[in-house]
Amino acid sequence: LKDLRFNMAYVRGAIGRIELVESGAYHFAIGSQFAVEHEIQCGREIEAVFNFGVGSYLSKHVLLLRDHGKNGITEGMRVAYDSESLDQSCLTTNIVKGKKVELVNMRTQQTITALLDGNIDAGVWNYDDVLENHCLDDLKVVFLTESEYNEKFSTAVMVIRKNNKYLKKILEKNISVSKTLEILSDVCK
């Protein structure tokens, strides 16, 4: 895309990004494969142009616990729940299924502070941030089981408005998935 002029913006939540693409305000957006497929099944007028593969969105999600003596979600816990984040809300719902917990509605970005301040007991988080951020050493990291986690949450997908053949051709001509993954790998080193 070096020969094309375009702007980039951060928009919180895949649903918001998808709505902006669908409305024509944005030409394309990145979201998790899970969120994109969910929104397409819900009738959104979008389509996936590129799938960047497992681990391209983030390496994986984990469960963070305030109490190091716990190994997972237990009855009575207060658990972070971001109703505006499709990935986080679906993961959280799956993890707490069948347990009597209190879902505490908050932005995903507030999870760490809420855990450290004792306002919640557990929350879903990005494992890449755990590896980079040493203030998280005070929290217990629990890896999610196969039944709790789907690789589609960690897979980046580029979406455009449905049937925008002109834009699709431009993107396919100018974006290489392998080159993008090479750059991503270099950035992560």
Locations of regions flagged by a protein language model:
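A ligand-binding cleft/hinge motif common to bilobed small-molecule-binding domains
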Residues: 30-43, 113-150
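Bilobed "Venus flytrap"/periplasmic-binding protein-like clamshell domains
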Residues: 1-2, 58-111, 164-169, 182-187
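General small-molecule cofactor/ligand-binding pocket signal
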Residues: 7-11, 102-106, 142
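Hydrophobic beta-strand segments of well-ordered beta-sheets in folded domains
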Residues: 27-28, 72-80, 100-102, 119-123, ...
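Periplasmic-binding protein-like
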Residues: 46-67, 128-183
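Contiguous, function-dense segments enriched for cysteine-driven chemistry
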Residues: 5-8, 19-22, 28-31, 116-119, ...
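Short helices/loops that flank or line small-molecule/ion binding pockets
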Residues: 15-29, 94-95, 109-123, 127-128
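Short, glycine-/small- and polar/acidic-enriched structural segments
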Residues: 2-65
